[in-house]
Amino acid sequence: MHSRLLRHDSWSDQAHCRRIASVLRGEGHDSVASDVTSTEALRLNWRSVHGAVLAASLHAGTHPRAAREFVQGNVDGFNAVPSWFVSVSLSAASANPQERLAAGRIARAFLASACWAPRQLSCVAGRLVYTQYSLLTRWLMRGIARRERATTDASCDQDFTDWAALDRDTHQFGRDVRESVRLRTQAEHYKSDDATTC
C-alpha cells in the first residue's frame, strides 16, 4: 500500500511527517514524504496513491498558501483516496479553550476553501523551535510562550506534541487505507468476474 505524506516545509511539519511515515512503515505501508512545492509532489501520479496525508503549520491564523494551492490543484486525488489533514499549531496546545476551538475552525475553513473532504482531521500541537527562529520570530514566540506559561528559554526548543495521540490517529489512518485497498481490490475482482461471464 502506497501512502503519500505531503507537507509544507517547516520544522514542525517535517517532524510530524517523519513520525507518521515511521508508524505507517511499521505497519507495512510504503510511505513517501514530499514537500508540496517539490517537483516530485507537483508530478504526483494519483493512480498509484492509496492514501494521502497533508501536514501544514498554522501561523498567524492561516495555513501556507502553497499548501492550499496544492490541495486545490489536486483535490480530486485527495478526495478519491483515504486522506488526512494534520494542522500543526501552538494553538492546539493552548490552555485557553477558545484558542483550541479557533485552531479547529481555521483548519475546517482551509478544507472548505479547497473543497477537500478528508476522512480525518487532526489539530496537533507543534513545537517552539527557538534555536531555528530568526531574532524577530524568537522575540514574538517568547511573547506567546509567556502568555501560555511555557518556557521562554530561547536556548532550547520545546515540544508540545502529544505523540501518543498522533500515533493513534496514524494507526487509524493506516486501517482506513488498508480497508480501502481491500474494498477496491474486491470490486475489481468482481468486475473482472462479470466481464468473463458475459
Give the predicted meaning of each segment:
Residues 1-29:
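N-terminal beta1-alpha1 ligand-phosphate binding loop
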Residues 3, 26, 59-198:
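FMN-binding flavodoxin-like domain, especially the glycine-rich phosphate-binding loop
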Residues 11-12, 40-42, 92-94, 130:
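Flexible, glycine-rich phosphate/dinucleotide-binding loops
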Residues 16, 45, 63-67:
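Residues at alpha-helix caps and immediate loop-helix transition turns in enzyme cores, especially N-
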Residues 27-42:
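A short beta-strand-loop structural module common to alpha/beta enzyme folds
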Residues 46-47, 78:
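A short, aliphatic-rich alpha-helical micro-motif
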Residues 50-53, 82:
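Structural motif
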Residues 56:
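Glycine- and other small-residue-rich loops at beta-strand/loop junctions that grip anionic moieties
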